[in-house]
Amino acid sequence: MIKTPKIFQVGDVTITRVTEMALGGISPEIYFSGSWNPAFLEENRNCLPAGLIDGDSQLIVSIGTWVVKTPKHTILIDTATGNDKNLPLNPALANLQLPYLERLQEAGVLPEEVDYVLLTHLHVDHVGWNTRLIDGKWVPTFPNATYVFPLAEQQYYSSEASHNKENEANFNVYEESVLPVVEAGLTQTIGPEGGEFLDIFKFIPTTGHSIGQMSISLTSGGEEALFGADVMHHPFQVFNPEWNSMYCEFTEQARISRRRVLESIADRPVIYFSSHFPESAAGYVTRSGDGFKWDFV
């Protein structure tokens, strides 16, 4: 079930979650392949936040977009999976028919009103609504927006280098969801060092999950937030930073980036906006002994 989204305030910026999908019944043994330790759940079940697992102890995750409204601009951070996508090696996300644009409108945004689309990386569940299928052609969903993403991601996913076993879930994604906005002249890329954008944002390299992934920080009115991308897919990884998901392409670097992000935001008033956490998908990281813990807001 998709819940009514909260509206968050960071300085003079409002942030709203538009959820494309809420997914349950996900096996932790598979999702955290090679990392999952069932003893963690049994030992911590009574002190973990609610909403992380279903009644069968299977994971709950989400896919969606963060709508960011500043006094000057309407911005989307990541664009979920999209409808009608031809994903021959990822049938679970292929040919969807979901009311994402209707939910976006409920959040107060029409496609033509979007000024910028900021993409943390170019995986299937982050770029899908960049485009939609109109009369058999993929066209930009947000025709007046500039689509901004890491250059390293474009270079990799537009090349044969990405045609490998680890990247099967993303086959055909660049062609349907990224190339059309490139060809429309609507894109801007961020170099591998990251950098500031629109004065209030900063692209921060957090590679590992993908080759050029970047998290995006937001600072407004003396308050801070971090859009973490896929540094973590589920709150269990806050408690267990060494756990990778099955979708992390460069595993050791993914662990390094995850630990670095957790260290940077723990015990500071930085709200963390996740890409795939359940519930509100937002919260705070604090230290707990030698590790970390998570609380939703």
Where do the PLM segments sit?
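Metal-dependent catalytic neighborhoods of phosphoester/phosphodiester hydrolases
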Residues: 127-137, 284-285
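Short beta-strand scaffold segments in enzyme catalytic cores
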Residues: 64-68, 213-218
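Active-site glycine- and acidic-residue-rich loops that bind
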Residues: 127-129, 202-214
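Metallo-beta-lactamase
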Residues: 1-109, 113-125, 141-205, 223-229, 253-269
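Cap/insert and terminal regions of metallo-dependent hydrolase folds
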Residues: 91-98, 102, 219-297
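Active-site metal-binding loops of divalent metal-dependent hydrolases
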Residues: 20-21, 79-82, 122, 152-153, ...
